[in-house]
Amino acid sequence: HPANSYIYLYGNMDMEERLNWMDEEYLSKYDEIPVTSQIGHQEAFSEIRNVEMEYSVTESEPEENNSYLSYNIVVGDSLDVERSVAFEILDYTLLSAPGAPLKKILLEEGIGKDIMGSYEDGIYQPFFSVIAKNANPADKDRFLSLIRSALEDIVKNGVDKKAIEAGINYIEFRFREADYSSFPKGLMYGIDVFDTWLYDDAKPFERLKCLDIFDALKKKADTGYFEELIEKYLLSNTHASVVVVNPKRGLAAEKEKALADKLAEYKASLSQEQLEKLVADTKHLKEYQDAEETEEALKTIPLLKREDISRESAKIYNTEKHVDDTLVLHHEIDTNGIGYLELLFDMKYVPEELVPYMGILKSVLGYVDTEHYDYGALFNEINARSGGILFGISVFTDSKDNQKFTPMAGIKAKSLYKDIPFVFEMIKEILKTSKLEDE
């Protein structure tokens, strides 16, 4: 029934015509019915709750130092989009960026082999999590104590303003770019609107109006706003849990046996008539699933006609230029104010015995200290003024001979047009001054 659904339209269309068609062909054929689908509000805990769970590992996997520790804190509700975006920035600043302080202190103190952060805002009551992987469950209390002491120190001395600036730019850049890879943009926008629409019918578009929020957060960065969020929600908030998940060998087999026993008990409770009906129903379902569609049903599937497909191929906007002896390809297309840069270096000049080390080199460039920056400051500086600088290796096939290949070391970067000179400066900083001797 459409009363228990959410419908949205995306694209350049005659909206009135589409709405009328939807009403005539679909909605008008149903009577209105009440639907109780409001998500309930969980009351805050009076104290932090402790939970222990188990997960299955194979006989060859270790049980020692293979636990997960997580500290999870509820952060208001998802209808305050500015606060949600602020916590996305705090997740980046405290846990995700290289040199992030919360991640750094936990790793230095030997809490787990990896530290992850997350801010889950796709639900009515979002939560912020700090997670230690490959940890010792005996470190649970120290894990929580270190988190609290680190956060208290950050509140006292202030969040790194350059990291906040980088976090805001990092998230704003991706919002403006709206690059969802192979996923249709309209689909992803639709998923975004559910973050508020599901919980307030009057707020379907809040998640699509973030540009003003980014501007507001930039102004609040020096006002103590982010420190207040940490104090209120991460330090003075008992609506939280500490969850320990321990490995257990044979747990999967135990669960499979329990399920088999439950099914056997259910089967034993059935009469012969009920068993025969169950077998018949299963057979009918299998036949239905395997049956070929009728010609009538196949004709209901919309199909493209040949004339619907343009005979014109997509225009390629390639302009060849030369800067000294370097070939430059320039693509003059609409990129919403974002400049995309790719530098390619032919690897034929790399000695064969050193080629395997190129994979290591591309992984550390941008993640080690340079002449003017430590690795954390370098990462924040780049993200504060660009959409990132990435190093990689690509292999190109000859357009005339698919048996010929050219391996290339590459650098990809993106920024607003005004910051392209900055991007070149940072590429130069990384390539010429990275301290690769730092083990």
What are these regions (language model features)?
Residues 4-10, 66-76, 103-218, 238-248, ...:
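M16 family metallopeptidases and their MPP-like homologs
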Residues 6-66, 157-160, 178, 263-267, ...:
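An aromatic/glycine/proline-enriched structural segment found at the starts
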Residues 34-35, 243-263, 267:
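Terminal amphipathic helices with adjacent charged low-complexity linkers/tails
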Residues 35-99, 129, 184-207, 269-366:
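His/Glu-based metal-binding/catalytic segments typifying zinc-dependent metallopeptidases
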Residues 210-213, 217, 256-274:
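C-terminal helical/tail subdomains of lipid-metabolizing enzymes
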Residues 230-233:
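Core subunits and conserved enzymes of cellular information-processing
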